[in-house]
From Swiss-Prot:
Name assigned to this protein: Fumarate hydratase class II
Keywords annotated in UniProt: Cytoplasm, Lyase, Tricarboxylic acid cycle
Binding site for substrate: 97-99, 127-130, 137-139, 185, 317, 322-324
Catalyses which reaction(s): (S)-malate = fumarate + H2O
EC number(s) recorded for this UniProt protein: 4.2.1.2
Note: There are 2 substrate-binding sites: the catalytic A site, and the non-catalytic B site that may play a role in the transfer of substrate or product between the active site and the solvent. Alternatively, the B site may bind allosteric effectors.
Source organism of the structure: Staphylococcus epidermidis (strain ATCC 35984 / DSM 28319 / BCRC 17069 / CCUG 31568 / BM 3577 / RP62A)
Coiled coil: none
Site note Important for catalytic activity, residues: E329
A GO CC term assigned to this protein in UniProt: cytoplasm
Family: Belongs to the class-II fumarase/aspartase family. Fumarase subfamily.
Amino acid sequence: MSVRIEHDTFGEIEVPEDKYWGAQTERSKRNFPVGKEHMPIQVIYGFAQLKRGAALANHELGKLSDEKKNAIVYACDRILNGELDNHFPLVIWQTGSGTQSNMNVNEVVSYVANEYLKKHGSKETIHPNDDVNKSQSSNDTFPTAMHVALFHEVETKLEPALNHLRQTFKEKEDQYQSIIKIGRTHLQDATPIKLGQEISGWRYMLEKCEQLLSESKKHILNLAIGGTAVGTGINAHPEFGHKVAKYISQNTGYAFVSSENKFHALTSHDEIVQLHGTLKALATDLMKIANDIRWLASGPRAGLAEISIPENEPGSSIMPGKVNPTQCEMLTMVAVQVMGNDTTVGIASSQGNFELNVFKPVIMHNTLQSIYLLADGMNTFNKNCAIGIQPIEENINNYLNQSLMLVTALNPHIGYEKAAQIAKKAHKEGLTLKESAIESGYVTESQFEEWIKPEDMVDPH
């Protein structure tokens, strides 16, 4: 392998000739051969937005020349275009401040920027610390990159997936308003409900999660940039953070602002804890929805079988013809993973000792993973399951007509205790509810027909 020699304050080190990173990245690569979880590329893109904005801000404040500013912006734009993805090799298991990844970006930007300057005949040179990292610290850049990446992924991936699944349930809700089925509480028969009403509950869960997500993501717009090492802003112009936030906002279209309290921004990640709490809330709702659907679709001959769902693939390697609710199983596993991630994010975010939290990479990794799992999970669940939900009306009607809980409609007319006697007699003697009611002498046949109407029970008002 062809190599070149790079150096840092520790001395010289060999770096692959075809890679744009420098000495500090190479040392991290060698010092932390831990796991397979690489720093998410969206974090790198968040860094690129930041370094781009920092170059523009430093130039505006008279701290960076035109040539250097243009070169750094050029390099950052190449990163944002996805041209340099293979030059960011580090794993998340590194320093808890993300310093190595910050330097990885600084080194790649300086390498590409210097090529740009050389190509344009400039005698200027870009230094990864003195120019690309000017007015910055890893302590304020990594949390800034975290927030930029998280907001973008929520906006472009999670919210569209959530919206599409909600729309599907809304369509099913409207489509099945005329189908009356038996409700169930405690896994036991309850009073009737429309299939559309049941689905409306699922739809509203997602609608509420959209509202929670919209609220919690607002706090992610606060950026730590400008706090530098410990929140005091040492080595940065007082307006630097605000100007960087302005330039990031202009380039992304999102209304980022420099946090009003940098001491908080460096050591606390409560905004991400809140955001992930919303992801957990969504996961719990998706778990419930997926479980309801697979129970309602259980069978086909010995289950509830009130609905059918698409048959996507063979379900068993030994039982011919078996088809399983695999999309529901996938979504419930996604939900469990997100719940586990929430625990990790919460514990890691509680470790802000003094002026800095040093669990940032694992907070970021788990939060992004939850966003991607939820987005991908909802998209494939919607496409391969939810859209294809169909009622099996024969079974729905059989369960409805057999249910003893229709007796609830007699309460206002004969009282709870007499109605309970009718239900128990029917169950014990194998009678229909109507037969038991008439035999009890508490109601006549005409009264039963008048009072026991499932269609009135689902819309009592």
